[in-house]
Each structure stands twice: as C-alpha cells, then as structure tokens.
C-alpha cells in the first residue's frame, strides 16, 4: 500500500511540475507527451536518418578505410545547415544538456540493434575531448552517446582506450567528415592499441 501511495505522489508531483515547467521537444518546441524524451514523436518520425547502418561501403566507412582497423561505421542522422534538427547536437554539445546524448544514443541503438550492427562489437570507445575542452564543457558528448548505446546493447564503454593529445580550435566551420578525420586520425591516440586492433 505504501509503494502504491508513493507511486501516486510521484505521478502527481510529476504532473504538477509539467504544468509549471513543461518538457518540450528540443526540435520543434512542442510539449512532450508522457513517455517521450528529448524529441516528440512527430520530430522522431521526421528525423533525417542516414540509414548508413544498412549499407556496406557507406560514406562514413569509406572515410576511415585504410586509416585504422574498422569493421563498421555509421551516423544516425544528417546534420544539415538550417535544419531544426541541428538543435539536438547544439544543445548536447554547447547547451550543457548531456542527457540528450544518452537519450539519442538509446534511440540510435534501438534502431541499429535490429539490423545486427552491434554483433561482434566488444567495446564502445567514445572519441575523447582534449582535457582543456573537457574541463570547459564539463563532459564529453561522445561519452554520453556511448552510454546511451551501452544501456540498450549491454556493450561496455571504455573511456580510457583513446586519449586526445592535441588541442584543436573550434571545428564548427569544417564539414562533419573533416571533423571526424581530425578527431580520429590526427589527434587521438590509443592508450591500449591491442584493444582496438
């Protein structure tokens, strides 16, 4: 009886807070329905997914082939200039809303797991920030996305397998592929090479 009462109080309190401080979709600004996180169902349906996980030799894989050992690579959605969906990454990266990374990581994992994308993957290694940027931001958005993926897949996250040795200025003027190349090939260095070979 006490548990039921506690549950009802939590539900009532949550509903009251929603009236005062409604949770809104980070893309369109509409109030989120019960069970929705971060983005509403309409925006989730309209999310410009790449579906690269369904294509061998996709642009992300091609970018990294021959540069380091790689089995599979993908990106969840397109980052297009002028798109409202850019808010997701902007709030995650610069808005202090690290939880968005975990939520989007879970969304991504739920979709990718059905395709077998994660089969044979032993560890998730988020691309690190330089320690200076980590201190400024307070968190690594890549790590939070990895945590969300791990929550669905059960694959462990290793935040110490790779370190960033070189500090770079903002990469906002570079294409996504130029950013990945800088991050993965020129700046980051494995601390345990056998783990990622």
PLM feature spans:
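Glycine-rich phosphate/pyrophosphate-handling loop used in enzymes and phosphotransfer proteins
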Residues: 1-188, 192
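Short, ordered, surface-exposed loop/turn motifs in non-cytosolic proteins
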Residues: 195-197
